[in-house]
Swiss-Prot record:
It comes from Burkholderia mallei (strain ATCC 23344). One of its GO terms (biological process) is anaerobic cobalamin biosynthetic process. InterPro entries: CbiD, CbiD_sf. Belongs to the CbiD family. This is Cobalt-precorrin-5B C(1)-methyltransferase. The keyword Transferase applies. Pfam families: CbiD. Pathway: Cofactor biosynthesis; adenosylcobalamin biosynthesis; cob(II)yrinate a,c-diamide from sirohydrochlorin (anaerobic route): step 6/10. Keywords: Cobalamin biosynthesis, Methyltransferase, S-adenosyl-L-methionine, Transferase. The gene is cbiD. It comes from the Bacteria.
Length: 363
């Protein structure tokens, strides 16, 4: 007989960012070069001052006179694409003081403007760069070393893993980004996903795109492509995070925004929800019935919609009676968006059904 689920579930484990992994491995490799000591663990200081000890998978000299160290990325209980990946650093000592960063295998290179890293640079974000620089500077001072460090950061299978992220669309080619602002991955915080939404908007703006489309998934992206012929750089994969798009446009506005999603997702936005995930919002069938009434639905039809099992069934009932429920939902969703984005942004909403057909539009 299966044990009962405990009433108080265990707290979710936090993990460490790729930036923390890069800091730990680069420090361990550099310490081996300066002291001859290979470590099993390495202590680092996170951006907010926490001290953590990170276990290493290896720390060894290389044939070219340098050293390398690696660690297995532990994202805790967060569903992170890099969880379990080997993050490693290869370090060489150089005469010129300071730290030079390079993209090792599995780490991408920036090819488009709009990201916090210059075009042509390895996709190692500012905070991880600062963490590595500070740790290496402290190590050099401790051992009286006046030279510099050449640091290549890599991720095993990073190029394949990157295809599961937004990096290709952002113009980061060849692999993953080394990320993190606090050094810690908090379970289900989705901070990396939201950051990639913001970066997508930044890249579009920096490359002269004036019309972006924020879409909940692949089907909505396909619908937008077919309708407008927008390039990939103009498509923002917002998933469930409509609020992340709308709020960011307050400080990084564009001339035109198209919001496109499945009918059910868009009905949640229309009801005022900015997080469209089922954990945080649900379909309001009584509200859909009320809106159907606004569009001319009879009392009987409203009752049927109220009793529907799903939003798709509610939509099918409305369409069967020639009630444009999709348009009404789009109108309410547009109103919610308009209340958040700057006045100069032209907002359009599109709703699609399960087959990807447009069932509602408000320009």
């Amino acid at each position: 007989m299966r044990d009962e689920t405990p009433e108080q579930p265990a707290p979710l484990r936090f993990g460490y960012t790729t930036g923390s992994c890069a800091s730990a491995t680069s420090l361990a490799a550099a310490r081996l070069l300066l002291t001859g000591v290979a470590s099993d663990t390495v202590d680092i200081v996170l951006p907010k001052g926490q001290h953590v000890a990170m276990r290493l998978a290896f720390c060894r000299a290389t044939d070219d006179g340098g050293a390398e160290a690696g660690t297995i990325k532990d994202a805790g209980d967060d569903p992170d694409v890099t969880h379990g990946a080997l993050v490693f650093a290869r370090v060489r000592l150089v005469h010129e003081p300071g730290v030079r960063f390079r993209a090792g295998p599995g780490v991408g290179t920036v090819t488009r403007a709009g990201l916090p890293i210059a075009v042509g640079e390895p996709a190692i974000n500012p905070v991880p760069r600062r963490m590595m620089t500070e740790h290496l500077a402290a190590l050099a001072a401790e051992h009286g070393y006046a030279g510099g460090f050449d640091v290549a950061i890599g991720v095993e299978n990073g190029e394949a893993l990157a295809r599961k992220t937004m990096n290709p669309r952002l113009g980061i080619v060849g692999g993953l980004s080394i990320l993190g602002t606090t050094g810690i991955v908090r379970p289900f915080s989705c901070s990396a996903y939201i950051a990639s939404i913001h970066q997508g908007i930044d890249v579009a703006r920096a490359n002269g795109v004036t019309h972006i489309a924020a879409c909940t998934g692949n089907a909505s992206e396909d619908a937008v492509r077919a309708r407008y012929g927008l390039p990939d750089i103009a498509l923002i994969e917002m998933g469930d995070f409509a609020g992340a798009v709308l709020k960011y446009l307050r400080r990084a506005s564009v001339a035109r925004l198209t919001l496109c999603g499945g009918f059910g997702k868009l009905s949640k936005l229309a009801a005022g929800h900015l997080d469209l995930h089922s954990r945080h919002s649900s379909i309001d069938l009584p509200l859909l019935a009320e809106w159907a009434g606004e569009a001319g639905a009879s009392a009987v039809l409203q009752h049927e919609i109220r009793a529907a099992n799903t939003s798709q069934q509610a939509l099918a009932l409305a369409l069967a009676h020639h009630v444009p429920l999709g348009d009404v939902v789009c109108a309410h969703a547009r109103r919610v968006a308009r209340d958040i984005v700057p006045g100069e942004v032209d907002v359009e909403t599109l709703a699609i059904d399960r087959e990807g057909r447009i069932v509602g539009v408000v320009p």
